[in-house]
Amino acid sequence: MTVKVFAPAKINLTLHVTGQREDGYHLLDSLVAFVDQGDQVTATPATVSALSVTGPFAQGVPTDSSNLVMLAAGLAGFPMSLTLDKRLPPASGIGGGSADAAATLRAAARLGAKPVIAEGALSLGADVPVCLGAKPVRMSGIGEALTPVSMPALHMVLVNPRVEVSTPEVFKSLESKTNAAMPEVLPDWPDSLSFIDWLSTQRNDLEAPAVKRVPEVAAALAALALAPGAQMLRMSGSGATCFALFENRYTADAAALQLADSNPWWWVKSASTLPG
């Protein structure tokens, strides 16, 4: 039996850094959505666990226990032969490694005909629990507190200037680690336009330090700002991937083509959010 599991990209529509624990973990308040761009994990029962990596971003991806996919496979309780089709750029702020680990846990559950192994997800990384659900949520704490959120559909263009950003270094550059959270009670958004208007009043607290450390992030944001029909733009996670929101997928597709043509070295994709 072979199973294929999609590992969708995680987009931080907002990311407020609200504190830091004594153990060094940062406290976050973030609206998270998942989109129809991502990696794919293929799993087959085997006598010994092994990982191979294919796809446009396969080069340099480790296949040993330093890869979250192999660590997730270790929680399965049985060996698997795994293939990771790496379509998302690495270290890019859209949860690629965490999404891959979560997809591996889901693949193991399907192969073993057992519930998804949720208990060990947080031990793999702060973003793995949210990626395991792959649904719109408000994520707080260090990533373990997940509250489902009803969000209107969003259409966007994702841009990564093909530079990797160190999450620890971005956090080190953050001027304040005790910033305001989102409102305790989130508003109702009757449509995408009202949602985008509200999102524009929120923040990604990691954007400014990322721009300071990595000028290419500023270049990506500037290019998105000039895209016809762009309604709001922001960096996702700790970067370097940035996104702009559009009225519909058609407009996003057109903008993505234009941006890719103007910046052939960049990773540019149009995307739509997945339903809850």
Regions found by a protein language model. Name each.
Residues 51, 133, 138-232, 247-250, ...:
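Conserved, helical-rich catalytic subdomain that frames metal- and/or nucleotide-binding sites
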Residues 78-83, 106-124, 248-261:
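Phosphate-handling active-site elements
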Residues 18, 245-248:
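Residue-level recognition of strand-loop junctions within catalytic nucleotide-signaling folds
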Residues 1-92, 110, 160:
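ATP-binding N-lobe of GHMP and related small-molecule kinases
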